[in-house]
Amino acid sequence: MTTTENSLMPDVRNGIDFKVADLSLANFGRKELDLAEYEMPGLMSLRHEYAEVQPLKGARISGSLHMTVQTAVLIETLTALGAEVRWASCNIFSTQDHAAAAVVVGPYGTPEEPKGVPVFAWKGETLEEYWWAAEQMLTWPDPDKPVNMILDDGGDATMLVLRGVQYEKAGVVPPAEVDDSAEWKVFLNLLRKRFETDKGKWTKIAKSVKGVTEETTTGVLRLYQFAAAGDLAFPAINVNDSVTKSKFDNKYGTRHSLIDGINRGTDSLIGGKNVLICGYGDVGKGCAEAAKGQGARVTITEIDPINALQALMEGFDVKRVEDVIADSDIVVTATGNKDIILLEHMKAMKDHAILGNIGHFDNEIDMAALERSGATRLNIKPQVDLWTFGDSGKSIIVLSEGRLLNLGNATGHPSFVMSNSFANQTIAQIELWTKNDDYDNEVYRLPKHLDEKVARVHVEALGGQLTKLTKDQAEYLGVDVDGPFKPDHYRY
């Protein structure tokens, strides 16, 4: 698809508005959804537990999260629990087109007569298309029944609403600065156009939203920033910091999908290579374990002495980017920060070294500087580019244009680990929707007993057998026989 005035219009069939690559892929997508359900015991147990009581009835959830097969199972779990849903992806490359088609068609529809959920997502969106889709996801067809819940990944949906509110209060959308990223310019342009055609739109939406549940580290950071500034217009639950999300999705999911992305993108041997992982949080830990398991020689960069010490105790070197970049064969950013790999670092890299990012946004690698540098770009295949510097003649291989390589070059995290994360998302949506009066406009975490509930289901699915405390043992530890077993400050 390309961005034209005509293409940025939703399709409508059988009363459902949508925009996906190809509805004829729905049958393929449905087969993969059926397989994924067997690997997602958390979501399936929630369907079994709550289907009759319909706790999300009346909820109109706008979701911004990678439109994958696993996300499709999440969407159909939300609808099974009574919610109405509209969806867009949170990354221009992460959509699996057959999954998007399957969700629109639904389990009982056909491409000619879809009976599923409105989805606005396809792999390879332009920035203009991405933000158009985000607005479609937040714009419900009946103005008297607007979105009242947001499910977010990275915070783009939340930011669109809250920045819109800020600019409506100010009476003007600020002009873009010369050095602003291309995406920020597109974002401001969308808000400026909407300010001219539908003044007050975002304020109305913010007033109708009961809460947001946020999936990622990056999105959670945005929530805390909005809250600190007094601009958070509704309660938020930080799903990312549930133990069964961050310690599983972030680490074990990445441990699986990083290698998958590098292999599909380059077919390069990893064993014996020098691999530089920037960041040693949960995502970085998963990346480092994966590379080590392949036989690579792994070096870590870190700002935090505690994380750096952990890396050293695991046998990894800890160095600065500028000191090791020239010797690195593969470089992966996993920090959640910006400006980690700059143009000067890219120019210093080995000829044909591989560069990729597994943090949520594309600003960990300074792609804008690379594009301005005069380096020539040769597209090898989708999401794999060879950039050649004219002054040295050296080239580097950049994966997914500096965006998430595990979703751009591969299919993301496996179903089982996403079952943990998405079970938390579903529980958080139920919590905010059914107990909204208990929450102020602040950022919250799910209670420990719900974290343990999610873990218990997955332990059983893997054939694990939990030991049961006796009453005396529980009293000795000062806990209930059935948990929670650890205090909130416990570090797993």
Swiss-Prot record:
Main location (coarse class): cytoplasm
GO CC list: cytosol
Uppermost EC category: hydrolase
GO molecular function, one term: adenosylhomocysteinase activity
Pathway terms, separated by semicolons: Amino-acid biosynthesis; L-homocysteine biosynthesis; L-homocysteine from S-adenosyl-L-homocysteine: step 1/1
SUPFAM superfamilies (UniProt xref): Formate/glycerate dehydrogenase catalytic domain-like (SSF52283), NAD(P)-binding Rossmann-fold domains (SSF51735)
Positions annotated to bind NAD(+): 216-218, 250, 279-284, 302, 337, 358-360, 406
Cofactor binding comment, as recorded: Binds 1 NAD(+) per subunit.
GO terms of biological process kind: L-homocysteine biosynthetic process; one-carbon metabolic process; S-adenosylmethionine cycle
CDD domains attached to this UniProt entry: SAHH
Entry's EC annotation: 3.13.2.1
Name of this chain's protein: Adenosylhomocysteinase
Native source organism of the sequence: Mycobacterium leprae (strain TN)
